[in-house]
Swiss-Prot record:
UniProt KW keywords: Glycoprotein, Secreted, Signal, Virulence
Protein name: NLP effector protein 5
UniProt family annotation: Belongs to the Necrosis inducing protein (NPP1) family.
Pfam families in the record: NPP1
A GO CC annotation given for this chain: extracellular region
Residue window of motif Conserved heptapeptide motif: 123-129
Subcellular location: Secreted
Lineage per the UniProt record: Eukaryota, Sar, Stramenopiles, Oomycota, Peronosporales
Signal peptide: 1-19
Species this protein is from: Plasmopara viticola
Chain's gene name: NLP5
InterPro entries xrefs: NPP1
Sequence motif: Conserved undecapeptide motif, positions: 104-114
Length: 239
């Protein structure tokens, strides 16, 4: 049976939330979670870093009122997406695999566009990328067992993670890149990257969780939404 480990009880209720699109660089990020419970402490400890070799930097996707980013057109030449002045965000959601005593933590990043510069501009508005880390929580000292990064067509699995892709045996280094006319994707790298403020699913407001469940981003839901989260966990699991 699936057991989702929560820091605190999450309110479940029927809500009606009006969703408003906001300019991609005007979304206020959530404050980073505090290490005030075992799950948040674990998620902060194993938070990956992101090295941007090309393309947009990650931006906040949704604010506390449930307003979401309207993205950025792939054809707006000269428009910067090097990071929001309001701060950036990485979204986390966790699942406890009781059969193996492993915490599976998904980290997801939102990008206002996914554009590749070839002889012509190709791409689209709004994009998500994600990676899943697998942490052995059977002992007092949690250990990173594996990482699954969403690649070009499927998951790239690092089981066990390479030591030169890690900082302090905990923070996995990911590269955001593209090849040829492919879309952007994630892979392990030796290059140090940047950290974004982490907001966990259970710490988001009801409005934000509701609207991120309902919102379709370039034909798909956010990877932390119910429609995708459990499917991706099943597909990526390396054990």
């Amino acid at each position: 049976m699936r057991v989702l480990v929560l820091c605190a009880a999450v309110l479940t209720c029927f809500v009606t939330v009006s969703a408003q699109e906001v300019a991609y660089d005007r979304i206020e990020p959530f404050e980073e979670v505090k290490p005030d419970c075992p799950l948040n402490e674990l998620a902060l400890m194993f938070k990956p870093q992101l090295y941007i070799s090309n393309g947009c930097h990650p931006y906040p996707a949704i604010d506390s009122e449930g307003h979401f980013s309207n993205g950025l057109s792939a054809f707006r030449i000269g428009t910067s997406c090097d990071g929001s002045s309001k701060g950036s965000q990485v979204y986390g959601r966790a699942f406890y695999n009781s059969d193996r005593n492993i915490m599976e933590i998904m980290y997801a990043w939102y990008f206002p566009r996914d554009r590749m510069i070839t002889p012509v501009y190709i791409g689209h508005r709004n994009a998500w990328e994600h990676a899943i880390v697998y942490v052995d929580v059977a002992k007092d000292d949690p250990q990173l067992l594996a990482v699954a990064a969403r690649g070009m067509w499927s998951y790239r699995t690092y089981n066990p993670p390479r030591s030169d892709y890690l900082d302090d045996e905990k923070s996995f280094k990911l590269q955001y890149k593209w090849i040829g006319i492919s879309h952007h994707y994630l892979k392990g790298t030796k290059n140090p990257g940047e950290f974004q403020d982490l907001i966990m699913w259970d710490n988001m407001t009801v409005k934000a969780r509701h609207n991120i469940q309902e919102k379709t981003w370039f034909g798909s839901k956010a990877p932390i939404a119910d429609d995708k989260f459990f499917k991706y966990l099943e597909k990526a699991r390396p054990f």
